[in-house]
Amino acid sequence: MKFYFVQFTIAILFFACVKDKPTPLPQENVTLTDSKKVYIINEGGLNDNKSSVSLFDPSNNAVIENYFANQNNNQLLGSIAQSLSYFQSNYYIVINNSNKIIVCNNQFKKTGQISGLNSPRYFLPVSNQKAYVSDLYANQIHIIDLNTNIKTGSINCNGWTEKMVMLYNKVFVTNNKRNYMYIINAINNTITDSVFVGKFASSMVIDRYDNIWILASGEQSTSSPAQLTKIDALNLNTIKTFTFNQGQSPNNLCLNKTKDTLYYLNNGVFRLSITDTQLPQNALISAGSKLFYGLGINPNNYNIYIADAIDYVQKSNIFIYNTSGTLLHNFKAGINANGFYFEQ
């Protein structure tokens, strides 16, 4: 959940200058191919139990709008589907406002549930037996036994913990309520260090040279600008910091398959090579009247997937572009689509 009812003011939408292709209606009974599928995480609205996961087949453009319900006798996910991860033949669907993680098998049928969480955000396996879960309110990171799907401990970390990545047996975690990225020893579950990365750091990726890129959205009320920070994961030295103009709030940092090109949202989709020395001035894909809310890069063909929340009430539009910024296809998903998982 991105707290859109706090962070955004709904404005009057103007018609886009370029008319998009017609949007096909999703079908629940469709033919799927053997190609790699795309899962779309749909938050739904707050407390409305309309969270869902949509399935898209890029080879024939087939859509199953509510795939989890389709595979589980119309069972509801809960309130605010936040993220989706895949590990050891299991899918882990993090349901933020319902305080749980739903576990599914390869057929997306529910096989278990992880409970006892405050307000979970993201799931990260750190070994074959253990995973970490970040949390909005708990002031800690949850430790999960993957054999039993039970919380077995926690790591104290004040603030709103968010995205996590792992490298060199270290877990790097962003914190929306602190100015720092925290480093955790994944063997003994202790915080060992921290690095300044700016206000409201949320998304991060690891490039081809094992550098960590952290995107902080900034805080306008304290005149703290957004920034993109490049950190050496081995020695934790700050290699480069890019500072955005005051008033900008970039988010949703992504990386392509070769890990040499960054993408992010900033009222449009922007692209940055990991060797660039300054931020791009022009968007690769302009938002126009659209409300870009989620972003993903398909590692199988480099296509750019964008979720348009429209008005946070209607079902989201999903737009697919190639790397030249040309629109290839669009379709409907669930309410407030916020991200993508790509099969590989």
Outline where the language-model segments fall.
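N-terminal hydrophobic targeting signals that begin at the initiator methionine
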Residues: 1-2, 18
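Sec-dependent signal peptide recognition
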Residues: 2-8
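C-terminal motif of bacterial Sec signal peptides marking the signal peptidase cleavage site
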Residues: 14-16
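Predominantly soluble domains enriched in secretory-pathway, periplasmic, or organellar proteins
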Residues: 18-344
